[in-house]
From Swiss-Prot:
<dbReference type="InterPro" id="IPR029072">
    <property type="entry name" value="YebC-like"/>
</dbReference>
<dbReference type="InterPro" id="IPR048300">
    <property type="entry name" value="TACO1_YebC-like_2nd/3rd_dom"/>
</dbReference>
<comment type="similarity">
    <text>Belongs to the TACO1 family.</text>
</comment>
<keyword id="KW-0238">DNA-binding</keyword>
<dbReference type="GO" id="GO:0003677">
    <property type="term" value="F:DNA binding"/>
</dbReference>
<dbReference type="GO" id="GO:0006355">
    <property type="term" value="P:regulation of DNA-templated transcription"/>
</dbReference>
<protein>
    <recommendedName>
        <fullName>Probable transcriptional regulatory protein syc0529_d</fullName>
    </recommendedName>
</protein>
<keyword id="KW-0804">Transcription</keyword>
<dbReference type="InterPro" id="IPR026564">
    <property type="entry name" value="Transcrip_reg_TACO1-like_dom3"/>
</dbReference>
<keyword id="KW-0963">Cytoplasm</keyword>
<dbReference type="Pfam" id="PF20772">
    <property type="entry name" value="TACO1_YebC_N"/>
</dbReference>
<dbReference type="GO" id="GO:0005829">
    <property type="term" value="C:cytosol"/>
</dbReference>
<dbReference type="Pfam" id="PF01709">
    <property type="entry name" value="Transcrip_reg"/>
</dbReference>
<dbReference type="InterPro" id="IPR017856">
    <property type="entry name" value="Integrase-like_N"/>
</dbReference>
<keyword id="KW-0805">Transcription regulation</keyword>
<dbReference type="InterPro" id="IPR002876">
    <property type="entry name" value="Transcrip_reg_TACO1-like"/>
</dbReference>
<dbReference type="InterPro" id="IPR049083">
    <property type="entry name" value="TACO1_YebC_N"/>
</dbReference>
Length: 253
């Protein structure tokens, strides 16, 4: 198992906090809709839905909103004629960085137009289905927070259904198969590890290093824009940035 972190990917996706409460509610509601759509609408039998509900409650989303989101995902919400579907979009950012986007939409044309405009503004382009998805694979991701002793973590993971991990001073990210996510999260909690989040994520097979400051700035602006679009549920890119460039960019973005 290798232990090194790729900035601007998993950690970046989890560390960002939306400034507007409405955006937080919308994003968490979409997560519940997607989870209910992809599995059973019963949280006791659907780990992803149960996790999404826990996040929603922690953010202060009212129970009525949670129930509506689950019903919408299950297709049982009365009085709402909109039909939502999960759609995956793919494209390239500056420097040829591959970007994979998961969206939940009731209007594909609107979503595609918004994505296309965002890509074009920062020098990228929205591509055809399949153009970059082969560069990613879906895995289970468990995020741990706080100081983690690598030797102790590695010893624990040898007896758990983990495939690999990334570790730095702020915590660790442990990867596993889709089927093992619930078991891994539960067992890490039982061992006393501070599990902050557990979810399915698209992970790049390889990362592309970008060292040019302007290209990196355009890429991060593009990712920020994509993440705030109404229909977007998640954004993943095969981007890696040198630590010194990260430090320089943090002061300007």
């Amino acid at each position: 198992m290798a232990g090194h972190s790729k900035w601007a990917n998993i950690k970046r996706q989890k560390a960002r906090v939306d400034a507007k409460k409405a955006q937080v509610f919308a994003r968490l509601s979409r997560a519940m809709i997607v989870a209910a759509r992809q599995g059973l609408p019963d949280p006791a039998a659907n780990f992803q839905l149960r996790t999404a509900i826990e996040k929603a409650k922690a953010a202060g989303i009212p129970n009525d909103n949670i129930e509506r989101a689950i019903a919408k995902g299950a297709g049982t919400l009365s009085g709402d004629g909109r039909q939502f579907e999960s759609v995956r979009y793919e494209g390239y950012g500056p420097s040829g960085i591959a970007i994979l986007i998961e969206a939940l939409t009731d209007n594909r044309n609107r979503t595609a137009a918004n994505l296309r405009a965002a890509f074009s503004k920062q020098g990228g382009n929205l591509g055809e289905t399949g153009c970059v998805s082969w560069m990613f694979r879906q895995r289970g991701v468990v995020q741990l927070t706080g100081a983690i002793a690598e030797a102790d973590l590695l010893k624990a993971l040898l007896d758990l259904p983990a495939e690999s991990y990334d570790l730095d001073e702020s915590g660790a990210i442990v990867y596993c198969s889709i089927a093992d996510l619930e078991a891994l999260s539960t067992q890490l909690r039982q061992l006393g590890y501070p599990v902050e989040d557990s979810e399915l994520r698209w992970i790049p097979n390889d990362y592309q290093l970008v060292t040019d400051g302007e290209q990196a700035r355009s890429l991060l602006r593009l990712l920020d824009t994509l993440e705030t679009l109404e229909d977007v549920c998640s954004v993943t890119a095969n981007l890696e940035l040198p630590p010194e460039l990260v430090t320089a960019l943090e002061a300007t973005l």
